[in-house]
Amino acid sequence: MAARRPSPPPASPPPPRPRSTTTTRTTSSASAAPAAAQRLVAMAGSGKFFVGGNWKCNGTKESISKLVSDLNAATLESDVDVVVAPPFIYIDQVKSSLTDRIEVSAQNTWIGKGGAFTGEISAEQLVDIGCQWVILGHSERRHVIGEDDEFIGKKAAYALSQNLKVMACIGELLEEREAGKTFDVCFKQMKAFADNITDWTNVVIAYEPVWAIGTGKVASPEQAQEVHAAVRDWLKTNVSADVASTVRIIYGGSVNAANCAELAKKEDIDGFLVGGASLKGPDFATICNSVTSKKVTA
C-alpha cells in the first residue's frame, strides 16, 4: 500500500515532477487495482448511506428558517441517514423546527469537560440541547484554526464518551497530493483517531481532499474510490476487519446535485459530507437521494 500513489486532482497545476514519473505511478496503480478491488468489494461499509450537511459559518435566523422549511418539505429516501450541522447559535432553532427525520450536528466541540475555556462549547452542552453529532477534524479547523492530529483525536474520544456521534474528517492538501503523499497524510490522521477511539460504532469517516473543498474542483469518482478503499484497507490492518467492514466512509469536496450520482456508484463511497450545496434545500435533497445510484450498482 505504501508504494501506491494517488492520481493527481483534476484541473490542477501539474505536479513539479517529470512526466515519466507520473506515467509510472499511474501504471503501477492500475496494475494493482484489480487485486485491491477483489479484496475490498465485500468490505464496503455495511450501514445506511449517510449524508451530512455542513452549513459552516453561514445563515441568519430568516435564511435558516427557509432552509429548514425546504428540508421539511423534501421527500427523502428511507435508506439514508441525514444530518445537518448549523452554526452553534442556530442549533436550538433548527432542533425545534426540523423534522425528526433529520438529525442535528455541531461543527466542533471542546476537548474535555466545560469550564474556563472562553468561546468553547462542551460535548455536555451539545447533548443537553439535543445535538446528536459533531464534526471533528475538518480541514478548516486543521489549517485555519491550527488544530493538530493529536488534539483532534482526543476531541473525538471525549465526544464519544459523552454519547455524541462523530464525523471524523481526514484529507490532504493539494501540494501533498502532488507530492504523492495522500495516503501518508490520510493514514497519519487516521492513526490519531484510532489511537483514541476504542468503539467505532458511532463514527463516520469523512474523506475531504482539501484542494476540493469550496474550490469547485471535485475528485473524480475513481480518485475518491481509490482513497476510500485505501482507508478501509488501513482500518482492516490497523484496527480490525470488523470495523473496516462496517464503518461508513463518506466523501466531501464540492459535492453537488450534478456530480453526486456518479460518486455514489463507487463501492467504498458510503455517502457525502456536503458544504455549499447543503445550504440549498432542493439540491441537498437530491444529494441525499443519490443513494438510488448505489442501489443500481449493488
Swiss-Prot record:
FT transit peptide: 1-43
Gene3D superfamilies: Aldolase class I (3.20.20.70)
Low complexity bias spans: 19-32
Gene Ontology cellular-component terms listed: chloroplast; cytosol
Superkingdom of origin organism: Eukaryota
PROSITE patterns (alphabetical): TIM_1, TIM_2
GO MF, any single term: triose-phosphate isomerase activity
Keywords, in A-Z order: Calvin cycle, Chloroplast, Isomerase, Plastid, Transit peptide
BP GO annotations: gluconeogenesis; glyceraldehyde-3-phosphate biosynthetic process; glycerol catabolic process; glycolytic process; reductive pentose-phosphate cycle
Other information: In plants, there are two types of TPIS, cytosolic and plastid.
Protein name per its UniProtKB record: Triosephosphate isomerase, chloroplastic
Source organism of the structure: Secale cereale (Rye)
